[in-house]
Design a protein with these regions (language model features):
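Short Pro-Cys-Gly-centered "Cys-loop" motif that presents a nucleophilic cysteine in a tight turn
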Residues: 1-61, 68-238
């Protein structure tokens, strides 16, 4: 089966998950050091490849990003650069387990849930006791657990609109972060990423049809319905 082209639409954020072929901690001594280095590469590559970063989490088995690319190739180039740098540092072959998966995220509806999904990944999937304090994630900047700001973090308008001051925004986000996502939200995000279809309402998906790089939602399975002959004749007579 031919693989799907990347789904892209101008100005629309993308949720990205790139899985490593092998956990980094088993490929190099000092798992934290390689994550420090990977995070630096990520930060350095954003401006070079024209990517606005809204949220991120790095783990020993993958990269999770919420970002708005400047063009159709920006995110692909960024991920490829990270893969090349890792392969060189680890003196290995390919580092990713296949292609990264991505989905377009509807602003105003799914951006905050997507942020919570990726920033709570280490708690949900790794059993980390406090994912807010994960050093290789934007979670602490959004909840206020980290002091100061991150120069490369470009907060999405949905985050900015949640409060008038940084404290208000952090408090509002921390509340939703602590509350977590429903099982339905988790399932919708997982399905959109797995299928690489858009994550959003029917109205959002309808709008994407005229601007996206390819069809944003899965078509109906099976052959198109063939109308009975008597209906076809009726149509011609009308």
């Amino acid at each position: 089966m031919a693989r799907l082209p990347r789904l892209y639409a101008p100005g629309i954020p993308q949720l990205v998950h790139a899985r490593f072929l092998f956990p980094l901690a088993t490929r190099a001594s000092g798992g934290s050091r390689i994550l420090d280095t990977l995070q630096k590469w990520l930060f350095d590559g954003l401006a070079r490849h024209g990517v606005m970063l809204h949220a991120w989490t790095l783990t020993d088995d993958g990269i999770l990003l919420l970002a708005t690319p400047g063009d159709e190739k920006s995110l692909s180039r960024l991920i490829q650069m990270l893969g090349r740098n890792l392969a060189t540092t680890l003196r290995s072959g390919p580092v990713f387990s296949g292609r990264y998966r991505s989905t377009l995220v509807e602003p105003g509806v799914w951006v905050i849930p997507a942020m919570i999904w990726l920033e709570s990944w280490v708690a949900r999937e790794k059993g980390a006791s406090d994912s807010e304090l994960w050093p290789w994630s934007s979670a602490g900047f959004h909840t206020g657990a980290f002091m100061g700001s991150c120069p490369v973090l470009n907060d999405h308008a949905d985050y900015w609109s949640s409060g008038n001051t940084p404290f208000d925004r952090q408090a509002a986000y921390k509340y939703r972060y602590t509350e977590g996502l429903s099982s339905g939200q988790l399932q919708q995000i997982a399905q959109a990423l797995h299928g690489q279809w858009a994550l959003g309402s029917p109205g959002f998906i309808s709008q994407l049809c005229s601007v996206a790089s390819r069809r944003p939602m899965q078509g109906r399975r099976g052959r198109p319905r063939i109308r009975p002959i008597h209906e076809q004749g009726q149509s011609l007579e009308e």
